[in-house]
Amino acid sequence: CFGLTESISGSDPSSMETSFEEVSDGFIINGSKNWITNAPIADVYLIWAYSKDKTVHCFLIDKNTKGLTSEKIKKSSIKIAQAGKIFLKNVKVPKNSILPKTNGWKAVYSCINKARYGIAWGAMGAAETCWLIAKEYAQNRIVNKKPIASKQLVQKKLADMMTEISLGFSGCILAG
């Protein structure tokens, strides 16, 4: 799972508080992450942290590493993907746990932008599914011996929905 978001700073990486300190045989990481997708079930974690001089790196950490714990967050929606908190207390990792090319803010924002692109596609798929369900309902819901889909207002609402969805898909295609 991808551990960037924190309770205090949200998804603003420049306000991140999770830190690392270099020691002779690796790094010591301290901090916490919140609202991390799949944290309760992940086998490995990608954890972003900064040093005292504000150098940012991403570390690959095994779930069984001493000092690393996670807990599930109970959610009211999007339950298909679990979310959780990750706690890092004096987590010691070897020097080779730093992912290559993850030095600096450019790497952080590059990951965020790629994630946003994927999230946008997912949202468009969800919107299209909602439209299909609404259309099917309008075709099957009978009022006064006619489907409500025969009403001009319902047709307009469905057409407006599809127009907005098409614009969203176009935006995703242009962004990619």
Please give the residue ranges for each predicted region.
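A short, Trp-centered hydrophobic/proline-enriched beta-strand micro-motif
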Residues: 1-5
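Short glycine/proline-enriched turns and hinge-like loops at secondary-structure junctions
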Residues: 12-14, 38-42, 80-81
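A short core secondary-structure module
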Residues: 30-71
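Short loop segments at secondary-structure junctions
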Residues: 23-25, 50-54, 63-66, 89-96
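Glycine-rich beta->alpha junctions and the first turn(s) of the following alpha-helix
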Residues: 69-167
